[in-house]
Swiss-Prot record:
Gene3D superfamilies: 3.30.160.20, 3.30.70.1660, 6.10.140.1950
Keyword Heme on entry: no
Gene expressing this chain: prfA
Protein name stated in the entry: Peptide chain release factor 1
Organism: Helicobacter pylori (strain HPAG1)
Predominant place of localization: cytoplasm
């Protein structure tokens, strides 16, 4: 038996053990144990199904090879072996993907943060354009998008947008979007037709609960102030806006979208926890980088990961040297899989 077959047999054995345990009275009466074992079984269910199929194909190959000695059945066995070898190859490819260590955050919802960088108003306009593309992509994936906070500029763009995206596998699909996105195009206000270069930053932060990120209340500085509108005008006569600063890291979050101070505080605290968790992930990635052949990207906001060149209808993904000449179609349709799928494939290849 090959090393792969032995590994798959042990996975199947464990899956059967878990099935038996989950039906035992002892486990059923222990909610904590039941949840723990159910989670473990769920995590190996897909690989178990593929393993069963793969081992069955190996057995069929063995039987058909024995039939090659039979004059009457040898031709039939040859044809059957051709089909089985293709099935074996396809299953091995799928199984290799399933055996790649899963990112524990892959099933989490995310906070998506887009922030205008260099380029003034044009950067702010692109924040809105890219956010719309992400919303269209979310629609295609049947995810839900909820704007948590937004700050508009004077020309219809945004200084910043923070949104909560909920759905199956959100983090697994969008985690590689973190970094600096550069846009090159002719602004509508540009009479000479000159191309301007602007940049925005994207942060992808997994939504976390109190268990994953615990904050000591004494580490927080909470300030309240009146919410302001465009040009500094006051839009609220009460101190409903909230700023929370985590003193050990100096990470700060301000929130004024809600009329209620309590709601603003709750939103700000959730985003603060997500940012602290994001910081932990970045530190882990840097520590683990030595053990990886290459990283798709550090997730660092300062890393320039992609260029959107509108005059050439070109999207360049710098981390994997991918160039697509369908920029406008991708932005309008929201079909970001054209970029995301190659990024995921590249990341997975680093584990092979």
């Amino acid at each position: 038996m090959s090393i792969l077959a032995e590994k798959l047999s042990s996975i199947l054995k464990r899956y059967d053990e878990l099935t038996a345990l989950l039906s035992s009275a002892e486990v059923i009466s222990d909610i904590k144990k039941l949840t723990e074992l159910s989670k473990e079984q769920s995590s190996i269910e897909e690989i178990s199904i593929a393993s069963k199929e793969y081992l069955s194909v190996l057995e069929n190959i063995k039987e058909n090879k024995e039939l090659l000695e039979d004059k009457e059945l040898s031709e039939l066995a040859k044809e059957e072996l051709k089909i089985l070898e293709i099935q074996k190859s396809d299953l091995e490819t799928a199984i290799k993907q399933l055996l790649i260590p899963k990112d524990p955050n892959d099933d989490k919802n995310i906070y998506l943060e887009l922030r205008a960088g260099t380029g003034g108003n044009e950067a702010g306009i692109f924040v809105g354009d890219l956010f719309k593309a992400y919303c269209r992509y979310a629609d295609l994936k049947k995810w839900r998008v909820e704007i948590v906070s937004s700050s508009e500029n004077s020309v219809g763009g945004y200084k910043e947008i923070i949104a909560l995206i909920k759905g199956k596998g959100v983090y697994s699909r969008l985690k590689f979007e973190a970094g600096t996105h550069r846009v090159q195009r002719v602004p509508e206000t540009e009479s000479q037709g000159r191309i301007h270069t602007s940049a925005i930053t994207v942060a992808i932060m997994p939504e976390v609960d109190d268990v994953e990120v615990s904050i000591n209340p004494s580490d927080l500085k909470i300030e309240v102030f009146r919410a302001g509108g465009h040009g500094g005008q006051c839009v609220n006569t009460t101190d409903s806006a909230v700023r929370i600063t985590h003193l050990p890291t100096n990470i700060s979050v301000s929130m004024q979208d809600e009329k209620s101070q309590h709601k603003n505080k709750d939103k700000a605290l959730k985003i603060l926890k997500a940012r602290l968790y994001e910081k932990q992930i970045e530190e882990q990635q840097l520590a683990n980088a030595k053990d990886r052949k290459e990283q798709v990207g550090s997730g660092d906001r300062s890393e320039r990961i992609r260029t959107y060149n509108y005059p050439q209808n070109r999207l360049s993904e710098h981390r994997i040297n991918l160039t697509l000449y369908s920029l406008e179609e991708i932005m309008l349709s929201g079909n970001l899989d054209e970029v995301i799928n190659p990024l995921i494939a590249h990341a997975q290849s680093q584990f092979e």
